[in-house]
Amino acid sequence: MAKKGKEVLNALDAAKTQMYHFTAIVIAGMGFFTDAYDLFSISLVTKLLGRIYYHVDSSKKPGTLPPNVAAAVNGVAFCGTLAGQLFFGWLGDKLGRKKVYGITLMLMVLCSLGSGLSFGHSANGVMATLCFFRFWLGFGIGGDYPLSATIMSEYANKKTRGAFIAAVFAMQGFGILAGGIVSLIVSSTFDHAFKAPTYEVDPVGSTVPQADYVWRIVLMFGAIPALLTYYWRMKMPETARYTALVARNTKQAASDMSKVLQVDLIAEEEAQSNSNSSNPNFTFGLFTREFARRHGLHLLGTTTTWFLLDIAYYSSNLFQKDIYTAIGWIPAAETMNAIHEVFTVSKAQTLIALCGTVPGYWFTVAFIDILGRFFIQLMGFIFMTIFMFALAIPYDHWRHRENRIGFLIMYSLTMFFANFGPNATTFVVPAEIFPARLRSTCHGISAASGKAGAIVGAFGFLYAAQSSDSEKTDAGYPPGIGVRNSLLMLACVNFLGIVFTLLVPESKGKSLEEISREDEEQSGGDTVVEMTVANSGRKVPV
């Protein structure tokens, strides 16, 4: 690596933790706060949408979204997210992280508002408009994954880099919690202001006209935190690593870094001949043998583990309400009015978020640079597997009223170890182990693989969790394999996560250039290197 360029990057790695590091966490993290709020808040209002738009006169049960509509409403944002992760991940490497960072946020703001303003002449028309806006909302959310992770990894020092990236991702927990709290406040306010009988007393009167405002307000609220951080995102300079390693402008990199971090460094413009173009192997692209040789197993590890994790994680999160209903923790729908049902579902999800989801994220932040990424991910998958089997095998035991608290504790622990485990580490590792010129792209590919898993979870679990008894299925659904067997399947998915975690290298305590071998590339070396995974002595070829 050219001397001046290496000085800039070494200064970043050695920089003390400063106020701007925390500012960057908040700026990037508020995007993830919004991401989680928008992606998970829909699960709080889907039952209300069914009551409002798909009520059937003389039916003994409140209206529910038809299977295809429910699948679309729950899953379309993930389809957009997958596309956004691939597109903006690639664009972040081509144009720079900063240039496209504001676009993703504005998409989130506009489409959050659009979701709440969905319209149509018929029920299906309203749902189609909602799905349109939620697809593009997901597209913006998708871009935030690779860009936020890459920006934070390239700003951070090597000592606390894992904690900084994990802290950005941990804002998801607050987003999920905020979704539940906002929904609680809105539904409680409307429930007290517009009294309504239960469905079994008055099927039509149980859904007051004002209920249509509840879901719209909940969805539109997601625009506020994103809008508040737009200005600060636009003020962030390009990362020094992108400017020095990809744009090849060391002088600008040093200048940008000095503006935000307390590091005095003067760099001169470097000749192009000093760049890593001296050896063709060191300018390899994504679809080359050289990339496959150096990083193929790494990319396979990050994509498969994120895919498997999101099948279990998103199916569990999106359909908490169905699991709670199945074990009897949430009363039968006909015993509540429409708005009170939103309140009840929100209360359950908020409790789980408070007890399991949020603490898990911040345990990762606290321990990731101590225990390492590999250990935390492996531990998380192991405990998720154990708790899923513990929920599924004695499932009938948990359905008894006196055992419901035990079920909720086990379920909370599953969510805890998902977040103090692979849900955080699958986000952190791809931002560290790939070269700067491909870092955002590879993170986008890994994240898109995760969202493919989320789509499988969102669409598959919706049908699979239906009772095998056709008389007990929700309206319009074919018989499924039941909640118990669905939980068994998720436990097996988590076990596969343990296996594929063995392909993921440890990146704790190393500089980004050391992990990705860019320091070797820049110096023109051609040494075969191995990366030690965790502290086990096991090595993965790179």
Curated annotation (Swiss-Prot):
High-affinity transporter for external inorganic phosphate. Induction: Slightly induced in roots during phosphate starvation. It comes from the Eukaryota. The chain crosses the membrane at residues 25-45, 71-91, 100-120, 132-152, 162-182, 212-232, 295-315, 351-371, 374-394, 405-425, 444-464, 486-506. GO terms for molecular function: phosphate transmembrane transporter activity; symporter activity. Belongs to the major facilitator superfamily. Phosphate:H(+) symporter (TC 2.A.1.9) family. It is found in: Membrane. GO terms for biological process: phosphate ion transport. This is Probable inorganic phosphate transporter 1-5. Gene3D superfamilies: MFS general substrate transporter like domains (1.20.1250.20). One of its GO terms (cellular component) is membrane.
